[in-house]
Swiss-Prot record:
InterPro entries: F-box-like_dom_sf, F-box_AtFBL13-like, F-box_dom, FBD, FBL13/AtMIF1-like, LRR_dom_sf, LRR_PRU1-like. This is Putative FBD-associated F-box protein At5g56400. PANTHER family: EMB|CAB62440.1-RELATED, F-BOX/RNI SUPERFAMILY PROTEIN-RELATED. Residues 372-421 form the FBD domain.
């Protein structure tokens, strides 16, 4: 899409269809003049929507008015992949010159995507120039197949940085007690640290932090990952299995104002949680050996998704999930999820939505005759008063799973909608969906108004 078409589409003046793809030279010149009459703020905003700063700078030749417009664009994006090795010096010069000539009062965003030819000194210079222009968001991505790039301590000089997103970077022990006083969003993807203490110091040096995303790998040099942030509201932690098992022992999470929690980690054994009274949503796909502590921290949650394949899931008696409205359980391991379901149903009096799904698609012994012997001793309150939606994806029709389906459909007197999707294959063999559907359709349902569907 050329610039003229881009600008016209933005204004809503033309439709993107085959019949109007060609513009003659006269109409193009007319459109350029017409667009040039737009207010400068609007033109600058339109330019900021172009993919890269190279594209933005290229518009300087459109007309005299456009010569310096690009210097006022508040978002800059650089990617060295568009330069071959022989022209890499041109890329370095282009980035430096673009930052030096930048005239907007605030540099809202700087995105750098760089590879092995880019050095720590190059990054350091660009960071310094960006800090001089009151940068708000900094994104640095280093190509994953070329190792990591060490970042300069100049980052600590920022007073205006609100969002920092790093990928494949090395962070040393360079952080001050209040390094990022304005930072609210921090993304650390496949970052190397100097040790446990560097993580604790880095995160605690962000007193205003609200959103933290951590994607780890097995070479991040951290065993005990501590996240202690008073005002944090959203936390996502992911440990990548791509490079083997990480040498990770535990998480320490102290975030009393957290509202959203998402952890996927099949290797770390322990997690220490402090109370999270404002937590609304939690997604946990973990292998923690002991779960008592984190269940105690989830009592205020409204939406809960659990996959505890390797965990011996237990929590103390007396815990009530009084706000739980939406529960999703992964059914990848019968011996684990059935126990969790039997515990949570009686302790979730307001549960309205129950979803079951085999997310990991593990091997299933379809000839196993084991039944569900962990049913609650009484019909849970949620089944008779609140449960309205029941969905089961990848239903395997084992004896245990059929017992669960029978129990829920029989005792749920408020159900409005039930959707069951049989698994396509079990242990490599195609399932007979017709037989499964006939069996489920014949079951007694406690709710006469429930709509039963099969996907």
């Amino acid at each position: 899409m050329n610039l003229i078409r881009f600008l016209l589409v933005f204004q809503g003046k033309i439709q993107m269809n085959e019949s109007r793809k060609k513009l003659n030279c006269q109409s193009r010149q007319f459109n350029v003049d017409k667009i040039s009459d737009l207010p400068e703020d609007l033109l600058v905003h339109i330019l900021s929507l172009l993919p890269t700063t190279n594209d933005i700078v290229a518009t300087s030749g459109v007309s005299k008015r456009w010569e310096s417009l690009w210097t006022k664009v508040h978002k800059l994006r650089f990617n060295d992949r568009i330069y071959d090795g022989k022209r890499y010096d041109s890329f370095l010069h282009f980035v430096e010159k673009s930052l030096i000539l930048h005239k907007a009062p605030t540099l809202v965003s700087l995105r750098l995507s760089v590879g092995p030819k880019c050095t720590a000194d190059d990054i350091g210079l660009w960071i310094k120039l960006a800090l001089d222009r009151n940068i708000c968001e900094l994104i640095i991505k280093h190509y994953p197949d070329h190792g990591h790039i060490r970042l300069s301590r100049r980052l600590c000089d920022s007073k205006t940085l609100v969002s920092l997103k790093l990928k494949n970077a090395i962070l040393g022990a360079i952080w001050l007690p209040t390094c990022f006083i304005s930072l609210k969003t921090l993304h650390l993807r496949y970052v190397k640290y100097s040790g446990d203490e560097s993580v604790r110091t880095l995160i605690s040096s962000c007193p205003s932090l609200r959103n933290l995303v951590v994607k780890r790998h097995n070479e991040d040099n951290v065993k005990r990952f501590a996240i202690i942030v008073r005002y944090l509201q959203s936390l996502t932690v992911y440990l990548s299995p791509l490079h083997g098992v990480a040498d990770s022992d535990a998480y320490v999470i102290n975030t009393p104002n957290l509202k959203y929690l998402n952890i996927k980690d099949h290797y770390t054994d322990l997690c220490s949680f402090e109370d999270m009274p404002y937590l609304d949503e939690a997604n946990l796909d973990v292998a923690f050996t002991h779960t008592e502590n984190f269940f105690e921290s989830l009592t205020s949650v409204k939406k809960l998704s659990l996959c505890l394949k390797k965990s011996n899931a237990q929590y103390p008696e007396g815990i009530i999930f009084s706000q739980l409205d939406h529960l999703e359980l992964c059914t990848c391991d019968d011996s684990k999820w059935l126990n969790i379901l039997a515990m949570l149903l009686p302790d979730s009096p307001k549960l309205r939505v129950l979803k079951l799904n085999d997310k990991n698609h593990d091997f299933v012994d379809k000839y196993c005759s084991c039944t569900w012997n962990q049913q609650p001793s009484y019909v849970p309150e949620c089944l008779t008063k609140s449960l309205e939606i029941f969905e089961w994806r990848n239903y395997k029709a084992t004896f245990r799973e059929r017992d669960v389906a029978v129990y829920i459909l029989k005792n749920s007197t408020c159900l409005k909608k039930t959707v069951i999707s049989p698994k396509l294959k079990i242990s490599g063999e195609i399932c007979d969906h017709h037989i499964i559907r006939e069996d489920l359709a014949s079951l007694f349902m406690g709710s006469s108004s429930c709509e039963l569907k099969f996907d």
